[in-house]
Amino acid sequence: MSPDEARADVIAWSSERSRVWLAAAERELEAGVPQLAADHAYYACFHLLSAIFLKEGLTLNRHSALRSALHERLIQTGRLERPWGSVFDRLAELRTKSVYAAL
């Protein structure tokens, strides 16, 4: 498998993971578990953004790096409307509270 083929496989996998996480978020919301729905929605966005950036040749290994790239490469350049950056930031905040609440 060539590096380009491997990258295409990871992009496809990340895109599919995004769909899976989004479906999980919808189920949790319908089940009345909004905190878990927000956590799953965050991961849907995370995987979709990872696929987008990987397609552009950028590999990001940290949540904070992905968040920075979202704002620098998509929001500030006008490729994505500013409210979507706020949505992602809010989901990231909810995820952090959910994951680290017991600590």
Feature-to-residue mapping (PLM):
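Terminal alpha-helical segments
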Residues: 1-103
